[in-house]
Structures are given as structure tokens and as C-alpha cells.
Amino acid sequence: MSLESLTVQTKYGPVRGKRNVSLLGQEYVSFQGIPYARAPEGELRFKAPVPPQKWTETLDCTQQCEPCYHFDRRLQKIVGCEDSLKINVFAKEINPSTPLPVMLYIYGGGFTEGTSGTELYGPDFLVQKDIVLVSFNYRIGALGFLCCQSEQDGVPGNAGLKDQNLAIRWVLENIAAFGGDPKRVTLAGHSAGAASVQYHLISDASKDLFQRRIVMSGSTYSSWSLTRQRNWVEKLAKAIGWDGQGGESGALRFLRRAKPEDIVAHQEKLLTDQDMQDDIFTPFGPTVEPYLTEQCIIPKAPFEMARTAWGDKIDIMIGGTSEEGLLLLQKIKLHPELLSHPHLFLGNVPPNLKISMEKRIEFAAKLKQRYYPDSIPSMENNLGYVHMMSDRVFWHGLHRTILARAARSRARTFVYRICLDSEFYNHYRIMMIDPKLRGTAHADELSYLFSNFTQQVPGKETFEYRGLQTLVDVFSAFVINGDPNCGMTAKGGVVFEPNAQTKPTFKCLNIANDGVAFVDYPDADRLDMWDAMYVNDELF
């Protein structure tokens, strides 16, 4: 394949990609770092993205681009640049006989970190299939989610979500040139990326831009997916050295001149103990925008938006891992005293519930009885805490999404649960939490969908390899056909059915070390307990 044959003409100008061989021996082509927006620098910092200017000379897109600014916890340093609103395209070939369906992936990271780079999201496994895989960078932290209240400042927030919206539109306008079908786009995301997918499903700004969605371990029903405004702009500016003159507009002017590294270094230090008790996960994340604009993503409470969501008409595959809550042990390892805090259970009753303190205390007692009936929490006895965090932080939000779909949608909802527990291949648990722990942590499933910096491929006779091929097969089948039933489910003698809309208990495809099974969700009774905390129509 010549270099000329790897040159593609986009709406904005020609780009050159390269030919690769995957870790599994599959030839594929890649285009990395294609601009989909102008660099959000100077006066464009914090604002909604602007489409790129056109170019005439062929742009070299054979190398990975820098990520958006963030603190990389794996590398323990601030990385990135501002000129990073770039998109990546991977496929077996760019001239297929018929256009291929597209999987457009949004990375997670709590809206504060993350990258589309191949060190975490390599295409080696998914390019086995007849799909086009697309990933992209979007702004995170304060640079992506700073919100000013005055319309005059022109920074209503959610710039990171608006980056995503522009990237989706770029795909519709350009993916045909790469062999993709703009009429068969599946929007997929993990964690904060999954919540982002749901924001686009409930926002009219993204209406009808894609045909299916995959939601992995994240939901707009989870409290961490929405930030409340508490004068964060001025607090951030003061932390960096602003003199306090000019109010919020003065703070914005100061922050536009500040070094991005200083913004990243100070943004997460703003949260107080009270903020965290009030369930504020980050100062800078998705927020209800203070006024309407043409690009507005969240005009009102997401809970209300979801009730008339355009996305209820399209199919969804949704799920998570069996021990999502292992993620929260990172904080407990640093602050083990939290497990013995007298308000451990009371503090995990959702603070936004409109109930009396007496009722809160009653629910706290139920949490204690359910997760620690005959013992007390400790680092040595952390399984109850892991289960409580799995349910509260991740699975209950997913459950509320599933219930809302059952009540309001006629489209299909497929639910999966991943419990692949490997001693060496659950990379997130091993490298970021604790290699001595067992279970399938939040983000562990990503190693079975995407290649990463470890360059590991399990042996073909292992359950890890079978799990990898199962996830790739199920996900790509949904992208291609809208039906996740595939060779790996058939091999296991399983039919992966959509959830019935009349049954309160949902079923899921359970992907485990010993194979696949279609079962009642194993921990449904725990989720029912969380459901009971909500009254009337507050659940969904």
C-alpha cells in the first residue's frame, strides 16, 4: 500500500495515515491527530469549540498527538497541550466494498483526566472486525468545564461536552472518506465517557447524530456526573494568584492568561470537606448552563431532560463490572480512618434525597445491615465497602437508566456484566489500585477491548483470551448489527436478549472466567434497597 493510497481528503484538507500490523497480526490503517477544532487558546480558552481552518498541504497524521491538559495519575505528572482537539480513525482498510459501521468512543477519567491515546485505547483488538473505530480528545478539568454565570463572558460551561458534539459532527461529515458509514454510528463511552454518551442522548444539541449507544459504567443518574456551581471561577483564580479585582469576569480574564499547568495543578485542591459531603465530585464537570446558547448541552436538570430524551428511540447496550467499587479503595488506602468514621453509612445515603433526617438514619441502618451485618468495616474487611461503592457510585445509576428505559422507551436495552478476574490481565486493578486484590474493578474491562502500553496479549488457551474475544465479538456485533448476539455467545449456547419492559428484575449477559451466561442480575436485591430510598417519581 503506497503512501498516496493512505491520503484521505477531509472537509478541511488532506491527511496522511499509515499502515500497521496489530498485536494479533491484523493489518490496519491509522490516522491520528486530525484536527476537528481550532486550538482553544487565548480568547477561545474555556469557550465552545470552533471548527478548524482549512488547509491545503497534506497533514501528517501518522503519529499520536498530545492529550488535553490533565494530571496523569499513572505517570504522576501534568501532561498535554491546548492544541489537542484531535480525532483518530482506525480501520482494516479505507476503501471497503461497502461502507463500514462506526464505533465512536469517548474516554473516561472523571471529567478531570484521560486521553484518546493508544497507550490506553489501542485499536489492536477491535480492528479484527469490520468496523471503523474513532476516538478523540476533549477538554477536561477547568479547561473543559469552567462555567461563568454572566452571559457577557460567553463561558456558560460544558465546553468539553461541546467538543464531543463537534467531534460527532466531524464524523458525520468526514467518515465516509475513511470507509465508514455516517448513517451507522454507535456512540460508546466508559465511566465519565458513558455519562457523556447519555448527555448526548438527552440533549437536543446532539439529536439524531448517531444511531446506537454503548454505556459502560457511567450514567447521568449518578451524582458524580453533575457539578454544582460554588463560585469555582473566583476560587480557582485566587488559588493561582489573582488579586480579587473585577469579580468573576476579572477572574476569567486572569485565568485566560494563566499557565495551563497552573490551572491543572490547582483545580482539584478547591474541594472542601463540606463539598465532598455534599456529593460534589469535582469543581469542574458537566453543569446546568446558566443561560441558553445555540450550542447548549445541559439547559436544565438532566433528570428532567431524561424524561423527554430523544435517545429513548434508539437501542442501547449498558453494563459494568462485578466489583466496580474497588476503584474507591484508592482513597481508603490513603485515608483508612474513613472506614471507621461514625457517619460512614449515613454519609452514603444520597444527599439529594428529599427526606427527613430520621429517614436518613433509617436508611443508613439498612446499609449497615446489608453490607456489614455481623462485622465492622476495615481495610482487611473491605468487601462490604467495595459492594456498597459498586452499587452507590456505579450500578444504581445504571439501574435507574434501565428502569427509565423500561418505562419510557420502545427501543431495545441489552445489559451486560463483566466478572473476568485475572491475576495478570486486569490492568487497572493491578496497576492503579492494588495487585494483591482480586475482582473485576472499574475500568478492568478496558484491557479486554483495547490494547494498551503493556502490549500484552493473553495466550490463546486462557480464559483471558476467551474473555477478550467475547467482549470484542459482543461489542462489535452490536455496532454492526444492533444485536450483540455473535459467535462467542452462540459458542456458549447463550442468547443475549433485550430486557423485557414489563419485568422489574433485569437480566444480563454475564461474562466470566468460565464463559458466558444469560442470568438474572446477581445483585438485584441490593439495587432494590437503593431504589427504595427514592419516593414518588424521583427514581427516574
From Swiss-Prot:
It catalyses: a carboxylic ester + H2O = an alcohol + a carboxylate + H(+). Disulfide bonds join C68-C81. SUPFAM superfamilies: alpha/beta-Hydrolases (SSF53474). Keywords: Disulfide bond, Glycoprotein, Hydrolase, Serine esterase, Signal. InterPro entries: AB_hydrolase_fold, CarbesteraseB, Carboxylesterase_B_AS. Overproduction of nonspecific esterases is a common mechanism of resistance to organophosphate insecticides. This is Esterase B1. The gene is B1.
